[in-house]
Amino acid sequence: MFNGIIYNKGIIKDIKKSHKYISGSLVLEIASKIKFKKSDIGESVSCNGVCLTLIRIKKKSFLFYLSKETIKRSNFKNAKIGQHINLEKSLLHG
């Protein structure tokens, strides 16, 4: 669940076809100062209002999985390298 308040911004660094996942899916690399830990891999992150799964953490960027259905139904079908993006971590629960 997300609260709708954008605390972080990022820039799309790369968009690649995913060979590891389902055909037609993409991996989106976003550069940002947002902080993630290894234990956050697999968590949901709101990226421009779309819930995406964090799949890898790099030094200054993060990789997210986009399914074929997500691409079809969201603004990510028009995403471009260099585009700014709003980021929001999910709320803590428990």
Label every model-predicted segment.
Residues M1-G94:
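Conserved loop->alpha-helix
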